[in-house]
């Protein structure tokens, strides 16, 4: 284990120095995944095992781990690998995970960002936060307990939040004698439940022991009846080809960069599609068109940018653009929605009620929304729907919202950035919920050939800088 603790330094040496090592890391594909399941299924231990077996632990960390394992560990004489991840003092002393803990590690094939999410029901909102940026979910099942309510809850939330790759890991197989029948039974149980989930899921199953490392990074000699890949092999090989490249261009403007009179750029992260120099783009909601003149980054100009890249676009024309505006391909006609049906994960003690107004943020755009009605709340255990008057803490339901101004929205399953929103309490400024757009309602087309480009720009300018004039949006907004 001491040898493993020096492995990162050894990897740097093998690559020929720090710069060569960093260059190799930059060109690896990235997989974001989370671990979730019921209470004490071994999520933090599994992450600790992955870090340990992929040689991501430094000597001082290992020394501290030995000391802490003896003082507050839960595994007797063995290393308590969960302590590598459970950072909060309350977590370490209780042996549970409360907050979402993020960790980074890499192998020769891929880079990973892990979100260790809490298993307790009262922290389901934390799990939803962790799942919102992930491509794959590891659902841990305790081999002594089987598929539990929280496992079903997390499966539903993960798929609701757009995750299509699920790995069902039956953990603690050492406590049931590594019996194949136990693994097979829980696999059948989960597949029976999964019939209620979306049909386009990629579900894989693996039996393992996170504490001892069986089938985590190396095959288990104690489960020779299992001929499938190890967990790490699944993580390294799962197909996460970024389908966002094939999607329509979406570039939400986060910041207008104007350091001097000679430069005006629009900074943000490319959400979907590909943008290139010379491409014709349209600015929404104004509808003004222009051409991409430059794609600026910290490392120099690009000729083309891909989804996920933080860039600054310079347009060929002087156009009035502000934070919250959206750049799309000039050939596209995108609708702005006055109302929308939104799947809501509620995160506040105070329930969501009909008639209440909240501030919301969508892709950098901030406005106000009113709850028109709650169509139903999902009963997580059975995935049935029931009529409710309010949506409580950790509740998930379908809600109709009415916006103060038309918003440019996509279905969340199509685009997380332009289809996802957060609810903010207007008094405390606390985030109280997450919304996932299912359907835009009462839309108006942004194309309107009755007005010239000058008229549209002037109208947008007046509404932005002279709101007390009460000017109406020429495209149908307020």
From Swiss-Prot:
<feature type="region of interest" description="G3">
    <location>
        <begin position="116"/>
        <end position="119"/>
    </location>
</feature>
<comment type="function">
    <text>With CysD forms the ATP sulfurylase (ATPS) that catalyzes the adenylation of sulfate producing adenosine 5'-phosphosulfate (APS) and diphosphate, the first enzymatic step in sulfur assimilation pathway. APS synthesis involves the formation of a high-energy phosphoric-sulfuric acid anhydride bond driven by GTP hydrolysis by CysN coupled to ATP hydrolysis by CysD.</text>
</comment>
<comment type="pathway">
    <text>Sulfur metabolism; hydrogen sulfide biosynthesis; sulfite from sulfate: step 1/3.</text>
</comment>
<dbReference type="GO" id="GO:0005524">
    <property type="term" value="F:ATP binding"/>
</dbReference>
<feature type="binding site">
    <location>
        <begin position="116"/>
        <end position="120"/>
    </location>
    <ligand>
        <name>GTP</name>
    </ligand>
</feature>
<dbReference type="Pfam" id="PF22594">
    <property type="entry name" value="GTP-eEF1A_C"/>
</dbReference>
<protein>
    <recommendedName>
        <fullName>Sulfate adenylyltransferase subunit 1</fullName>
        <ecNumber>2.7.7.4</ecNumber>
    </recommendedName>
</protein>
<keyword id="KW-0547">Nucleotide-binding</keyword>
<feature type="binding site">
    <location>
        <begin position="171"/>
        <end position="174"/>
    </location>
    <ligand>
        <name>GTP</name>
    </ligand>
</feature>
<feature type="region of interest" description="G5">
    <location>
        <begin position="209"/>
        <end position="211"/>
    </location>
</feature>
<feature type="domain" description="tr-type G">
    <location>
        <begin position="28"/>
        <end position="244"/>
    </location>
</feature>
<dbReference type="GO" id="GO:0004781">
    <property type="term" value="F:sulfate adenylyltransferase (ATP) activity"/>
</dbReference>
<comment type="subunit">
    <text>Heterodimer composed of CysD, the smaller subunit, and CysN.</text>
</comment>
<dbReference type="InterPro" id="IPR044139">
    <property type="entry name" value="CysN_NoDQ_III"/>
</dbReference>
<dbReference type="InterPro" id="IPR005225">
    <property type="entry name" value="Small_GTP-bd"/>
</dbReference>
<feature type="region of interest" description="G4">
    <location>
        <begin position="171"/>
        <end position="174"/>
    </location>
</feature>
<dbReference type="InterPro" id="IPR031157">
    <property type="entry name" value="G_TR_CS"/>
</dbReference>
<keyword id="KW-0808">Transferase</keyword>
<feature type="region of interest" description="G2">
    <location>
        <begin position="95"/>
        <end position="99"/>
    </location>
</feature>
<dbReference type="Pfam" id="PF00009">
    <property type="entry name" value="GTP_EFTU"/>
</dbReference>
<keyword id="KW-0342">GTP-binding</keyword>
<dbReference type="InterPro" id="IPR054696">
    <property type="entry name" value="GTP-eEF1A_C"/>
</dbReference>
<dbReference type="InterPro" id="IPR050100">
    <property type="entry name" value="TRAFAC_GTPase_members"/>
</dbReference>
<dbReference type="InterPro" id="IPR009001">
    <property type="entry name" value="Transl_elong_EF1A/Init_IF2_C"/>
</dbReference>
<dbReference type="GO" id="GO:0006790">
    <property type="term" value="P:sulfur compound metabolic process"/>
</dbReference>
<dbReference type="GO" id="GO:0000103">
    <property type="term" value="P:sulfate assimilation"/>
</dbReference>
<dbReference type="GO" id="GO:0005525">
    <property type="term" value="F:GTP binding"/>
</dbReference>
<dbReference type="InterPro" id="IPR009000">
    <property type="entry name" value="Transl_B-barrel_sf"/>
</dbReference>
<keyword id="KW-0548">Nucleotidyltransferase</keyword>
<keyword id="KW-0067">ATP-binding</keyword>
<dbReference type="GO" id="GO:0003924">
    <property type="term" value="F:GTPase activity"/>
</dbReference>
<dbReference type="InterPro" id="IPR044138">
    <property type="entry name" value="CysN_II"/>
</dbReference>
<feature type="region of interest" description="G1">
    <location>
        <begin position="37"/>
        <end position="44"/>
    </location>
</feature>
<dbReference type="GO" id="GO:0070814">
    <property type="term" value="P:hydrogen sulfide biosynthetic process"/>
</dbReference>
<comment type="similarity">
    <text>Belongs to the TRAFAC class translation factor GTPase superfamily. Classic translation factor GTPase family. CysN/NodQ subfamily.</text>
</comment>
<feature type="binding site">
    <location>
        <begin position="37"/>
        <end position="44"/>
    </location>
    <ligand>
        <name>GTP</name>
    </ligand>
</feature>
<dbReference type="InterPro" id="IPR011779">
    <property type="entry name" value="SO4_adenylTrfase_lsu"/>
</dbReference>
<dbReference type="InterPro" id="IPR041757">
    <property type="entry name" value="CysN_GTP-bd"/>
</dbReference>
<dbReference type="InterPro" id="IPR000795">
    <property type="entry name" value="T_Tr_GTP-bd_dom"/>
</dbReference>
<dbReference type="InterPro" id="IPR027417">
    <property type="entry name" value="P-loop_NTPase"/>
</dbReference>
